[in-house]
Amino acid sequence: MKQKKVKKAGLRKGGFTFKQFFVAHDKCEMKVGTDGVLLGAWAPITKAKTVLDIGTGSGLIALMLAQRAPQVERIDGIELDEDAALQASENAQQSQWSSLIHIYHHDIYQYAQQAPTRYDLIVSNPPYFEPAVACRNQEREQARYTKTLTHEGLLDSAQQLITDEGLFCVVLPYLIGEQFIEISQRKGWNVVQRVNIKDSADKPYHRILLAFQRQYQGETKPCNIEELIIRNNDGHYTTQFQSWVTDFYLYY
């Protein structure tokens, strides 16, 4: 007798369903992806009371951090693209953390001048392509290229907005992350945590997670370095990666 395939329960379209929330992203140029999930799952948040997500997009990282940290009192998301900001706000309002997450349609440079508070944790999954061939629309160009948010400007804005002992965390392609470290050191930041990421054991590093603290009076702090391998040689997720996402992904 021929067996019938068991269908998974229907999932909502136009976004990504996590265990405790849904992220609609059909109005966002940059969709839910592994980079954002990695940053949201890793960013050190246990001591934070106030959190800022720069370039929040769909609000994915803000929602993940809200789930991870019940002690947090405020999470603000800043987004330059109006449609994405509206969708992030809708995602937050439809979640169980609607009173915690606030989304602002704003330029981060202007926001840094008038922010209502300083932040214990600032996160960003920033654009990293240098301006080159124009994208098909302005919104996608903002999401992908450093034209409207340079790495120098991002570091300067974070420095204005962070608390004295706060952490600033980013996810970037590996080689661009190394360049980002050089820029950060010139601007008075210490790298205190980093995770070098490769897709499988036999592949080179392709992503990097970085956590920075402000440098005072030339002091340097030790950097804790880890490695994350996403897939085994058979293509399945490693136990290590599964442990990172088990609180979020439906089938882990």
Swiss-Prot record:
One of its GO terms (molecular function) is tRNA (adenine-N6)-methyltransferase activity. One of its GO terms (biological process) is tRNA processing. The keyword S-adenosyl-L-methionine applies. Keywords: Cytoplasm, Methyltransferase, S-adenosyl-L-methionine, Transferase, tRNA processing. It holds the Pfam family MTS. It catalyses: adenosine(37) in tRNA1(Val) + S-adenosyl-L-methionine = N(6)-methyladenosine(37) in tRNA1(Val) + S-adenosyl-L-homocysteine + H(+). PROSITE patterns: N6_MTASE. One of its GO terms (cellular component) is cytoplasm. The keyword Transferase applies. Coiled coil: none annotated. InterPro entries: DNA_methylase_N6_adenine_CS, SAM-dependent_MTases_sf, Small_mtfrase_dom, tRNA_Adenine-N(6)_MTase, tRNA_adenine-N6_MeTrfase. HAMAP family: tRNA_methyltr_YfiC. Belongs to the methyltransferase superfamily. tRNA (adenine-N(6)-)-methyltransferase family. NCBIfam families: tRm6a37MtseTrmN. This is tRNA1(Val) (adenine(37)-N6)-methyltransferase.
